[in-house]
Amino acid sequence: MIYMGGIVGNNSLLAKIGDYGEIEYLFYPQVGYETHFFDSALAVYDKKVKWHWDDDWDITQKYIEETNIFKTILEDDKIILTIKDFVPVSHNVLIRRVYIKNKLDKKLNFKLFFYENLRIGENPITNTVKFLEDGCIVKYNGKYIFCIGSDKRIDSFQCGNRYSKTSAYIDIENGILKEHKESSGLLTDSAISWNIKIDEKRSLAFNIYILPQRFDGDFSIITEQLKIIMNNSENIKNLSMNYWKHIIGEINRFIHPELRQNNKIYSITKRALMTLLMLCDKEGGIIAAPSLHPDYRYVWGRDGSYISIALDLFGIRNIPDRFFEFMSKIQNADGSWLQNYYVNGKPRLTAIQTDQIGSILWAMDVHYRLTGDRKFVERYWNTIEKAANYLRLVALNFTPCFDLWEERFGVFAYTMGATYAGLKCAYSMSKAVNKRDKVKDWGKTIEFLKHEVPKRFYLEDEERFAKSINPLDKTIDTSILGLSYPFNLIDVDDERMIKTAEAIEKAFKYKVGGIGRYPEDIYFGGNPWIITTLWLSLYYRRLYKVLKEKDDNGADIYLQKSKKLFNWVMKYSFDGLFPEQIHKELGVPMSAMPLGWSNAMFLIYVYENDKVIIP
């Protein structure tokens, strides 16, 4: 079995599909907010019940190439049950296309059940589940309503309470639904069933529709909407297919022809981009990951900046622009941003991580350099100026803050690199709006950092750079690479930086390989990360290019190192999805998957022409 799971969505509705093909939860009406725990299940009843999580299914999962349709195949000795999940670009509905194939040389008769134990909203309250004469189930509270229907006639139903005798779950275990039409409570559940009859070696298919809306007390609005979607399902699907085809076509313009010759890299590149698009909300926020454990369904300026850059590099310009508009609206009066936000713009964690401020300015400058759009700089100049002025004060005072890993407080190498890059990018953009003369202090601060940071962070005895000063932390940490890549405060071929990178490489001895954050890491047990492995790979590739330009005979070894690390990352792509971490012993995904930053770093590597992102 391939333990993977996936996501499907548009810019308002995002669904997480679990390892067994179950719907774990939905985000609606925005990507990442609110959370609706679905707890769905499929079951087959043929004299006894067989749930989709039972051991004797052979389960595989994958995306259909060049689409955001996620396919789960459950196979046993009698049937092949295939579920194709997708959310169309035009409608906020999850469509589950169910295919059932009879493998035997005889006719099959059994029941198929769809079960839900949906908890609506961030703070679930009493809700009601009801079977309507229209042939669908509705579940609602005072704010939202969900409608579950099918284009195949429903043969039976049950509305009950999960931990009571009326539970639809218990009914499925018995194979007969009681057909109670309504139930209210905190933990209502429901089920619908179909009597399946399939001739030998034949197949049948039908759709299950899950439609969420805001609720004003009128059932007819959502039931009419469901009918429209059901009657036009093929057109809705074709519209989405054409949209995805257009996206891939645009991406192809920015992928080097040689890259397209490597089918695996090309396939992962397309999937990584399409995955990032599903993390982008219609209001401009970009969530770090569609994950609840750990809870990453929020907007971090850092993660959003890396994702914006990745999208920009491959020609997707409107989403980064929308992200910058979102960040501009929520910027603090002093020019800073808080640690993270809900996608509706409300603050969640209120600490300051200065590196995020620098990252946002860096991403804005990359966008400007790729587009040459001076009006973009004019539109956001107030945002840029406030952020740069904040960074200048931080830089001159070496002001401490929380590190990018959100674990420690101090003055960090990565943070100072991001501060330098943010100031340099703001200074660069000032020329586009004829403001260079008014921001000369930024230029002086850039030179100050260029001189002071290497001097203050260098450890003479260890012959490498420190993780932080004030307090001094000599820990070998992969984020120190940020001083050079991507932020360019220290030259990539500076001998001190090379020795720092080599110390990082030697510090990790995981059974499965890869590079972690720092050797003493205990988060999820301390594992190799996708972003840190790519980070060192990117640094080595950049070093190779610089040394090659200088005809240095030692350049090739760094290209070999870079490729080895990149190949490790390729090995741990799960049908194009990258997690945050890989288990150091088992080689399975750990923590959030997909993680936006992991996918973005892969795309930055694949783009190859890193000059455009170096400040």
Curated annotation (Swiss-Prot):
Pfam families in UniProt: Glyco_hydro_15
Active site: 403, 406
Any one Gene Ontology BP term: carbohydrate metabolic process
Family recorded in the similarity comment: Belongs to the glycosyl hydrolase 15 family.
Enzyme Commission no: 3.2.1.-
Keywords: Glycosidase, Hydrolase
Gene Ontology molecular function, alphabetical: hydrolase activity, hydrolyzing O-glycosyl compounds
Superkingdom of this protein's organism: Archaea
Record-given protein name: Uncharacterized glycosyl hydrolase MJ1610
InterPro entries per record: 6-hairpin_glycosidase_sf, 6hp_glycosidase-like_sf, GH15-like, Glucoamylase_active_site, Oligosac_amylase
NCBIfam families: oligosac_amyl
Organism for this UniProt entry: Methanocaldococcus jannaschii (strain ATCC 43067 / DSM 2661 / JAL-1 / JCM 10045 / NBRC 100440)
PANTHER family in the record: GLUCAN 1,4-ALPHA-GLUCOSIDASE (PTHR31616:SF0), TREHALASE (PTHR31616)
Keyword Chaperone: no
